[in-house]
């Protein structure tokens, strides 16, 4: 997903927390646009969508992009060595994933990160005082799990990660939460933690579905009318 006008804020966010030479995984790298935030020698983009990986490799040939399997069980593994990376970058990713799967991913991230490594993340978030943005995000975004900062934080804590909030960027109807997460050896695991879809999502889902698929229905209808007039 792409949110307009977030570019400068993202460059500033990463520029303050990444140094050349640190090994980076861009998890859910999409079409590769965020690769430019990092040095090609430091970067691996991981993505489940084969066509997006192919497009990324065409657009950014100096960078490394790989197709990865879905993580659905505790036995599934990402194709990355233990304790091998300094940073895992998550940009507009987690809100597409239910909390059960997020927790499985966090365990994998814990395995992959070096000691002292960190997760740098950007996610749309619900802010109680920002009702208009909360509605707009859920109307136009395909992600079903836009939750609050507190819920994101609790989800990370349930897998022994501490959260350091960095900033909230407000742009084009979105509240984009920037944060850093680090593993805490003193933390505890809560296997029973989970989050649900918010009421915002439940009420706006029909509108979102119409906006996502309605244009194709309209296009088919227009083509049908044109063909009917031609023949």
Residue spans of the language-model regions?
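Core SAM-dependent methyltransferase catalytic element
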Residues: 167-207, 216, 220
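Conserved alpha-helix/loop element of class I SAM-dependent methyltransferases that forms part
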Residues: 4-20
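A short glycine-rich, Lys/Arg-flanked "PGG" loop and its adjoining helix->strand segment in the class I
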Residues: 103-115
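A conserved beta-strand element that flanks and buttresses the S-adenosyl-L-methionine
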Residues: 89
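Conserved class I S-adenosyl-L-methionine
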Residues: 21-30
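C-terminal alpha-helical "lid/dimerization" subdomain adjacent to the S-adenosyl-L-methionine
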Residues: 121-159, 163-178
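Juxtamembrane boundary at the C-terminal end of a transmembrane helix
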Residues: 225-231
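Class I SAM-dependent methyltransferase SAM/SAH-binding core
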Residues: 30-76
């Amino acid at each position: 997903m792409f949110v307009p006008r977030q570019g400068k804020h993202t460059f500033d966010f990463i520029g303050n927390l990444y140094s050349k030479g640190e090994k980076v995984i861009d998890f859910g790298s999409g079409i590769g646009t965020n690769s430019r935030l990092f040095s090609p020698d430091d970067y691996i983009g991981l993505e489940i969508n084969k066509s997006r990986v192919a497009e990324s490799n065409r657009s950014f040939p100096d960078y490394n992009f790989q197709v990865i399997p879905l993580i659905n069980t505790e036995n599934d593994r990402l194709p990355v060595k233990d304790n091998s990376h300094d940073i895992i970058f998550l940009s507009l990713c987690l809100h597409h994933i239910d909390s059960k799967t997020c927790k499985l991913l966090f365990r994998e991230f814990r395995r992959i990160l070096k000691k002292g490594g960190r997760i740098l993340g950007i996610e749309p978030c619900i802010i109680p005082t920002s009702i208009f943005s909360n509605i707009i995000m859920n109307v136009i975004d395909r992600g079903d799990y836009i939750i609050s900062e507190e819920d994101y934080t609790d989800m990370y804590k349930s897998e022994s990660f501490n959260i350091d909030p960095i900033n909230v960027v407000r742009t084009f109807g979105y509240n984009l939460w920037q944060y850093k997460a680090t593993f805490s050896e003193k933390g505890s695991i809560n296997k029973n933690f989970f989050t649900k879809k918010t009421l915002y999502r439940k009420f706006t889902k029909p509108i979102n579905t119409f906006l996502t698929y309605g244009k194709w229905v309209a296009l088919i209808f227009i083509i049908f009318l044109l063909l009917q007039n031609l023949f």
